Design a protein with these regions (language model features):
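Binuclear metal-dependent hydrolase catalytic cores centered on His/Asp/Glu-rich metal-binding motifs
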Residues: 6-9, 94-126
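Core catalytic region of metal-dependent phosphoesterases/phosphodiesterases
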Residues: 2-93
């Protein structure tokens, strides 16, 4: 991340420190996308392991820049212990359910295009 300027210096260490200060082993952490710069799942493993080594149960959702996120079964098989992928389904822990779906422009919204957006919108319905 250092390539983006001094603000990003030591970014991984700062994430670890802040995470450990705020998150305990029994906490649930939602990670709503843009998880890795990788283009392929194999290349994202190091980032997933980084997240997996941190405390808490982690729920990951695919972001619009998560190009590495391939078939859900492959992603789930690659996740370290304590990490779970949500994609048009839910995760339940301690009587709390969290649903995960890709957000998209809805019919009737400004900028919605029937030809460009309908198929994606319908695919992401839960």
């Amino acid at each position: 991340m250092d390539v983006f300027g001094s603000t990003w210096a030591n970014h991984p260490q700062r994430v670890i420190s802040a995470w450990r200060d705020a998150v305990g082993e029994n906490d649930l952490v939602l990670i709503p996308g843009d998880i890795s710069w990788a283009m392929r799942l194999d290349d994202a493993i190091c980032d997933l392991e980084f997240i997996g080594a941190l405390p808490g149960t982690k729920l990951l959702l695919r972001g619009n820049h998560d190009y590495w996120w391939s078939a859900l079964g492959k992603v789930r098989a690659a996740l370290p212990n304590g990490c779970f992928a949500l994609q048009n389904d839910c995760f339940t822990i301690d009587n709390i359910s969290v649903c995960g779906s890709r957000g998209w422009v809805c019919p009737g919204s400004s900028g919605y295009s029937e030809t460009k957006d309908r198929a994606i919108y319908e695919r992401e319905l839960i």
